[in-house]
Every structure is written in structure tokens, then in C-alpha cells.
């Protein structure tokens, strides 16, 4: 099969690596890709938002399957446009991608189909949003309705913080994404990410992960797209997984079909595990980044065969095989991230990681300049490891990371701390 993968991050490098291992694969292309992906795929210099050029490329190369990595092209309807041209594509329709593209859409769906989530209000102007906030009190959560690259959420611990968040949304901090805000109840508990692959009818669990959103050690500093992750999430016990499928995922699949937008693709539930059980924080309609990296490290099954089954509506025939060991990934980011990122610094000694057992390096925001690997974005490298325990995977990842010569890079030194503490307590 000839496959076109769309995207350029660490998530896409992990997908490319796994797709390249499939015996079904004849040729892998990636648009636009990155220097790490170039080792397993032929790169095409086409941006993820250039739908017409992506469609033309898929036709020219007789592509059998398109796999869409990031959320933005899905929310703007790339999958629909490709299907209209007769191209097989893995990813939700524009209508189904509203689960990620509009927080308000998802909250309304939860209300209609009795999916557990926090109480909420939707507002298209600041005075009404502020009145609701004053009525509810803090802590409270303020979210831009649309796509804001994981940065449009403020968990306000004080009333003033919440009111300021409303102002920044309506003053255009997130562009069109902030034209409407969702204000919702603060949920107390432990967060987890839960992933399913879906074919419109069936949702097959791909397991859980926990990511680390804040930039600094001890969960301090501003939110980011994610500074590291591990899988599985210990809080997602077999009972919690069963409840999540029964109370959240299955009603969502039924609800989306009922409103005429059946969901196929990756459904990523951001959960809060509360004393009452799982509640939905948000849905994403693609793999998480960096959660995808740890899921791919643990997946033994053929990813391409799995995606084919999803595209063909055959997931009810599929069973998956996973490694028993946990996986953990640490993000190395460029100086200044998540604010003003300094690009162009040279990264050396990456080849030293190639021979380490149980370690895989995924490229995210890397670029090639004069034959050298340089920082081309905010989150740049993902050092990923598997081992018998999370503590051992953590040690392995940090040991490998220290071999990289990149003074301008930084990372959190405590990725996996929750699971490591649990392991110690359970000894």
C-alpha cells in the first residue's frame, strides 16, 4: 500500500515509525514531515492546511490511504474533501471533528446524551459570561470555544483570574477560537487521557496515558501542548476503562450517529477521574502529542492493518496486542517555550541514542540547516523509553536524554512522578 501521512510533529514521527514497520506498506510519504520522519518516509513539502495540494499529491502518487495527524485540517474538512475525490482517508469528517473544534458543541452533546461532564454555560459576550462566573464562584474553568493549540483553557482559582480570562478571549487572544467561551465547573480528581480507534459504529480502546501540561517541574508555570507522558495511566483500572467505555465513549458514538455525524478516526477523551467516576473534560479527534509516542511504543499489532480495518468499518473483527511494559516520553523544548521560542540552535549527538535498548527518539520541531539538525519549533525532541516499571522507563529516558548536546534545550525532570510515587507506595 502507498500511504500519505499528514503532519510534522513527534506524533507523526511515532505514527510514521509504526506504519513503516507494517508488511502491508509499499511506500510511505509524509507532508510536510521533519528530519526524523525522513528516515522512514519520502517527504513532500506541502503544508497541512493546503488541502488542494495534498489532494493533488495523493492523486498523482496513487495513494491508497491518507492518515491525518493534526487537528486543524480535520476541523476544516480535509477528510471530507478527500473522500469526495475518492481518496481513502483515516480521520473524522468536518461534522464529526466538531467534537474537538467546538467545546460548546461537545458540552451540548454531553447534555443531550447524558454523558458525565462538568456543569457549564456557553457565552458569545463578556458581560453574560462574567455574570455566570460571579454567580458560580471560583475555582472555575474558562475555555475558548475553538481550536487554540491546547492553550485556550484557563483553570481560574480566583474570581479575578476567571474574569480576566473572559476578557482575553473576547479581546482576541485566541483569534476566532475565542469568539465564544465555555465556562465550566472545576472538576476535582486525577486527569487521564483515553484513546479509542473508531469506524463510525465500533470504538476499540487503544489504552490510556497521562501527560504533563505545565512547562515546569512540579506542574508549575504556563500550560503547553504537553511536556511528557507515560502509558498506561495507573488511575485507569480495568473497572475505570469499562466505565469510560460504557458511560462516555459508547453514548458519544451513538449520539454522533444519531445527529448524522458518525465518528470514525481517533477519539481522544480528556478525563477527570473523580470520586464519582470518569467525567469528560474534552474530546480531541486525533492522537495526543506526546501521548501518541508512548502508545505506539506499546502497540505490538500492525498499525496499518488496524487503520485499514477502521476505514473499512471492520473494527468489530479486530483484537489488539500490547506490550506489558509501560512507556514514558520526555519532551525537550527550545529556550523560551511556550512563549517566544528561540529557533535555529544546533542539536548534536542524536545518533548516540540509536543503540540504546528500549529507547526511541522521535523528532518534533526539528529542521535541517546546512546539514545540521536545528530547533525549528517549540517542542523539538521526544525521548521515549519502555521498561518493566515506570520508574525504570523514566531512568532510561533521562539517561538517554543526557547524551544529547543541546545547551539551548530544556525539559522537565519529573515526567512520570505520579506513577513513580504510586509504584513506591505499592511495593
From Swiss-Prot:
Record's keyword annotation contains Cell wall biogenesis/degradation: no
Domain ATP-grasp: 107-312
InterPro entries: ATP-grasp, ATP_grasp_subdomain_1, PreATP-grasp_dom_sf, PRibGlycinamid_synth_ATP-grasp, PRibGlycinamide_synth, PRibGlycinamide_synth_C-dom, PRibGlycinamide_synth_C_sf, PRibGlycinamide_synth_CS
Binding site for ATP: 133-193
Top-rank lineage group of the source organism: Bacteria
EC identifiers of the protein: 6.3.4.13
Binding positions for Mg(2+) per the UniProt entry: 282, 284
Pathway(s) where this gene product acts: Purine metabolism; IMP biosynthesis via de novo pathway; N(1)-(5-phospho-D-ribosyl)glycinamide from 5-phospho-alpha-D-ribose 1-diphosphate: step 2/2
PROSITE patterns xrefs: ATP_GRASP, GARS
Cofactor binding, per record: Binds 1 Mg(2+) or Mn(2+) ion per subunit.
Nucleotide-binding keyword on record: yes
UniProt catalytic activity: 5-phospho-beta-D-ribosylamine + glycine + ATP = N(1)-(5-phospho-beta-D-ribosyl)glycinamide + ADP + phosphate + H(+)
Top-level EC class: ligase
Annotated keywords: ATP-binding, Ligase, Magnesium, Manganese, Metal-binding, Nucleotide-binding, Purine biosynthesis
A molecular function GO annotation: phosphoribosylamine-glycine ligase activity
The family this protein is said to belong to: Belongs to the GARS family.
Stated name of the protein: Phosphoribosylamine--glycine ligase
Organism: Brucella suis biovar 1 (strain 1330)
Gene name per UniProt: purD
Amino acid at each position: 500500500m502507498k500511504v500519505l501521512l499528514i503532519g510534522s510533529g513527534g506524533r507523526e514521527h511515532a505514527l510514521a515509525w509504526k506504519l513503516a514497520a507494517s508488511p502491508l506498506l509499499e511506500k510511505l510519504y509524509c507532508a510536510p514531515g521533519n528530519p526524523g520522519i525522513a528516515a522512514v518516509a519520502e517527504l513532500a513539502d506541502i503544508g497541512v492546511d493546503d488541502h488542494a495540494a495534498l489532494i493533488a499529491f495523493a492523486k498523482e502518487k496513487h495513494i491508497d490511504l491518507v492518515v491525518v495527524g493534526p487537528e486543524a485540517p480535520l476541523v476544516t474538512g480535509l477528510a471530507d474533501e478527500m473522500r469526495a475525490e475518492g481518496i481513502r482517508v483515516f480521520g473524522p469528517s468536518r461534522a464529526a471533528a466538531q467534537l474537538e473544534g467546538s467545546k460548546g458543541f461537545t458540552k451540548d452533546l454531553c447534555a443531550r446524551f447524558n454523558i458525565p461532564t462538568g456543569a457549564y454555560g456557553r457565552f458569545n459576550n463578556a458581560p453574560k459570561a462574567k455574570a455566570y462566573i460571579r454567580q458560580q464562584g471560583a475555582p472555575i474553568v474558562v475555555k475558548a470555544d475553538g481550536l487554540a493549540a491546547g492553550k485556550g483553557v484557563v483553570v481560574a482559582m480566583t474570581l479575578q483570574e476567571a474574569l480576566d480570562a473572559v476578557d482575553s478571549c473576547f479581546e482576541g487572544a485566541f483569534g476566532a477560537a475565542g469568539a465564544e467561551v465555555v465556562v465550566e465547573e472545576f472538576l476535582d480528581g486525577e486527569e487521564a487521557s483515553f484513546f479509542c480507534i473508531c469506524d463510525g459504529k465500533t470504538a476499540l480502546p487503544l489504552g490510556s496515558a497521562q501527560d504533563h501540561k505545565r512547562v515546569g517541574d512540579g506542574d508549575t508555570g504556563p500550560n503547553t501542548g504537553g511536556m511528557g507522558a507515560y502509558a498506561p495511566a495507573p488511575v485507569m483500572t480495568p473497572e475505570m476503562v469499562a466505565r469510560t467505555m460504557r458511560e462516555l465513549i459508547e453514548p458519544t458514538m451513538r449520539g454522533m450517529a444519531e445527529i448524522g455525524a458518525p465518528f470514525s478516526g481517533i477519539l481522544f477523551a480528556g478525563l477527570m477521574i473523580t470520586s464519582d467516576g470518569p467525567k469528560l473534560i474534552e474530546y480531541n479527534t486525533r492522537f495526543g502529542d506526546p501521548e501518541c509516542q508512548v502508545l505506539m511504543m506499546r502497540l505490538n499489532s500492525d498499525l496499518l492493518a488496524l487503520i485499514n480495518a477502521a476505514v473499512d468499518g471492520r473494527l468489530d473483527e479486530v483484537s489488539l496486542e500490547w506490550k506489558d511494559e509501560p512507556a514514558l516520553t520526555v519532551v525537550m523544548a527550545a529556550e523560551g517555550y511556550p512563549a517566544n521560542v528561540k529557533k535555529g540552535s544546533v542539536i548534536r549527538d542524536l545518533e548516540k541514542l540509536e543503540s540504546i535498548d528500549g529507547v526511541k527518539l522521535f523528532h518534533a520541531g526539528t529542521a535541517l540547516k546546512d546539514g545540521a539538525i536545528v530547533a525549528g519549533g517549540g517542542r523539538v525532541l521526544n525521548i521515549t523509553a519502555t521498561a518493566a516499571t515506570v520508574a525504570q522507563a523514566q531512568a532510561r529516558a533521562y539517561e538517554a536524554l543526557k547524551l544529547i548536546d543541546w545547551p539551548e534545550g530544556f525539559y522537565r525532570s519529573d515526567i512520570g512522578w505520579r506513577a513513580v510515587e504510586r509504584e513506591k507506595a505499592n511495593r
